[in-house]
């Protein structure tokens, strides 16, 4: 790993905060002090902060203002593991700007850069509009890259119990594809996971009449599931996808018929179908084959979609004003914490940096994009609240 110094001097308030966040070894579910940095800045602006330690996870909920629509900035301070640090061009928790103007470090894109831009955008907006209309909020967790049980999901339930209902939410996930702001995520597919266990009778391969092979019995059923059309999608979502991700059977010996097959699968589903309908149809297909089976289901998130409204209008117009081009609306990609916040009735979008290097060795984004992203967030607030 080279130790030659690149530019380690932040050129703006947004980059300075990003550097401070990137230095923290906040591998999920550890926050490593990132939230304290954000809270200190927000409290100076008059935010009321509620620290929420849920299980072993740090979260916080912060609000400013008493009346009017509530805009929430949402994100996560945790990052994925780096893998061998020797594979990185620079140490992953020593942020720097390289000779190409790229901000390098684990979390630069996903999503400490966005967090820094959110904080400085709010600082800029409040300085210019101290008596602004509406309310501002932050929902920040350190449990997004891991199980995502004690993070945003749990905080949302806490807010639901308190009767808090955000009107708008901007999630800072890296939504952009090739250049900043070219893509806005205005929805995400739902995710439904299942573990299918098909029971057979173990035996010797030379005596199949004394055994029952669950692989042979399950194969036609799995093929039927893979070939099924679950829906046709719609203008915003592709057709629902069924994928088998893991298949396990046998003892490892070549002369033993297995006694059980286990198949792990996942649906990524659109708003054209419900999780309950997918479960029912899966059961109906499997029952055709007279299998001895069980299924354990895990609903990771319902689909959500923001098709129109003040948030979409303000965001699209802000991208056009600041960047000079119109963003594309997309529901592609994996799940995000927006799926939990949408259940509170909020209009939800995702707007963040280019995602080309997320979860990769040498994660990086254009350093100049962070100051532009901060301007975008501030412009959205101006359009909504002035």
UniProtKB/Swiss-Prot annotation:
EC numbers for this chain: 3.5.1.18
Reactions catalysed = N-succinyl-(2S,6S)-2,6-diaminopimelate + H2O = (2S,6S)-2,6-diaminopimelate + succinate
Against InterPro entries, the record matches this protein to: ArgE/DapE_CS, Bact_exopeptidase_dim_dom, DapE_proteobac, Peptidase_M20, Peptidase_M20_dimer, Peptidase_M20A
S-S bridge residues: none
- Gene Ontology BP annotations: diaminopimelate biosynthetic process; L-arginine biosynthetic process; lysine biosynthetic process via diaminopimelate
> Do you know which Pfam families this protein is assigned to?
M20_dimer (PF07687), Peptidase_M20 (PF01546)
Chain ranges passing through the membrane: none
Report residues binding Zn(2+) 2.
110, 145, 359
Active site, renumbered? 78, 144 (proton acceptor)
- CDD domains according to UniProt: M20_DapE_proteobac
Q: Could you say which residues bind Zn(2+) 1 here?
A: 76, 110, 173
Describe which pathway this protein belongs to, using the record's wording: Amino-acid biosynthesis; L-lysine biosynthesis via DAP pathway; LL-2,6-diaminopimelate from (S)-tetrahydrodipicolinate (succinylase route): step 3/3
At the top level of its lineage, which domain of life is listed?
Bacteria
NCBIfam families attached here? dapE_proteo, PRK13009.1
Family, per entry:
Belongs to the peptidase M20A family. DapE subfamily.
Q: State the oligomer form and interacting partners.
A: Homodimer.
Protein purpose: Catalyzes the hydrolysis of N-succinyl-L,L-diaminopimelic acid (SDAP), forming succinate and LL-2,6-diaminopimelate (DAP), an intermediate involved in the bacterial biosynthesis of lysine and meso-diaminopimelic acid, an essential component of bacterial cell walls.
Q: Output this protein's name.
A: Succinyl-diaminopimelate desuccinylase
Starting at the broadest rank, the lineage of the source organism is: Bacteria, Pseudomonadati, Pseudomonadota, Gammaproteobacteria, Oceanospirillales
